[in-house]
Amino acid sequence: MVAIVTLTRQVLLTIALALFAQGAAIPEEAAKRDDNPGFVALDFDVLRKPLNLTEALLREKRDSISLSLINEGPSYASKVSVGSNKQQQTVIIDTGSSDFWVVDSNAQCGKGVDCKSSGTFTPSSSSSYKNLGAAFTIRYGDGSTSQGTWGKDTVTINGVSITGQQIADVTQTSVDQGILGIGYTSNEAVYDTSGRQTTPNYDNVPVTLKKQGKIRTNAYSLYLNSPSAETGTIIFGGVDNAKYSGKLVAEQVTSSQPLTISLASVNLKGSSFSFGDGALLDSGTTLTYFPSDFAAQLADKAGARLVQVARDQYLYFIDCNTDTSGTTVFNFGNGAKITVPNTEYVYQNGDGTCLWGIQPSDDTILGDNFLRHAYYLLYNLDANTISIAQVKYTTDSSISAV
């Protein structure tokens, strides 16, 4: 989910990476070795909505994308606590945005939005809350917005607390629940609707975790688990070495806003298609997106057809009975290679048709249908690298700090 940070000033296809459910326990043996192992592990729940163009034709979450993106698939929600009295919030973890905001207990929810069902925050009941008196505004590309006030308070993630964390207390929103953005600080929503900077860029949650000694490196790894799984894990400052095969290959980030690495080529149905440009890895985006010309090459090979679904809006559809055997291979600039089963590219729509899992856009985005197979995603914001390896779906765990 990527926040739109206009000079007015937010993010869903994103992340919308926003945090995930039931905190994952640190392995007992690690706890015995060191009370502070240098990482914080957190489980999350996978929240799924079916793709349905009749209800939500197009959704997108970033200002740099002119063609709307579909985000009716999974999102990733986790429980965190805010305040001296640990007020519990279930928030979406989002790698594409950078701000942590919660829903105020007196917030006004947009029409048809139940924004308070995942937990609310009452600043006056937290003795550690400090109102910064600056306006917070963030806008998503799908038109949803959140407004409120910047403040600081204690944030607790799976029993690990950081103090004085800058957060936004949202009093008006058309978003379903709060979002924990964990991207670069350069992508923070620090401008109001007139383009005036209301607060300086600040230490967001990953940065604060490092500065307060909870993790050793401003990095996090993401395990989205299998397509049918109900839970996954994010580890701040660590990596689970049991969750991938082969070795992690570090790819240099080519753009910090958003997190982009170089994609060299794509192999599909026996043909190799050279690409040679940047690709954004975004946990808040459901499908995979390529510029129109490149998407057309892949579509021709896959047998997908372009259909006009709205004014100036085209999507690829594919026969629901198409042969989904085989794989699509993504080759990255520094040698990383990720194999994705072709079952990830046929999506049942609500009307009996099937969407193709690759769609046209002005920008290249590798969404959840790619990321589920690319564990490990180790985002190292200190080294400006994203390390990836082929996923290994397993309940085994072997976490180490990075």
Swiss-Prot record:
Residues 76-389 form the Peptidase A1 domain. Glycans are attached at N52. GO terms for biological process: proteolysis. One of its GO terms (molecular function) is aspartic-type endopeptidase activity. Transmembrane segments: none annotated. PROSITE patterns: ASP_PROTEASE, PEPTIDASE_A1. Coiled coil: none annotated. It catalyses: Preferential cleavage at the carboxyl of hydrophobic amino acids, but fails to cleave 15-Leu-|-Tyr-16, 16-Tyr-|-Leu-17 and 24-Phe-|-Phe-25 of insulin B chain. Activates trypsinogen, and degrades keratin. Residues 1-25 form the signal peptide. CDD domains: SAP_like (cd05474). Keywords: Aspartyl protease, Cleavage on pair of basic residues, Disulfide bond, Glycoprotein, Hydrolase, Protease, Secreted, Signal, Zymogen. Disulfide bonds join C109-C115, C320-C354. The active site is at D94, D282. Pfam families: Asp. Belongs to the peptidase A1 family. This is Candidapepsin-1. It comes from Candida parapsilosis.
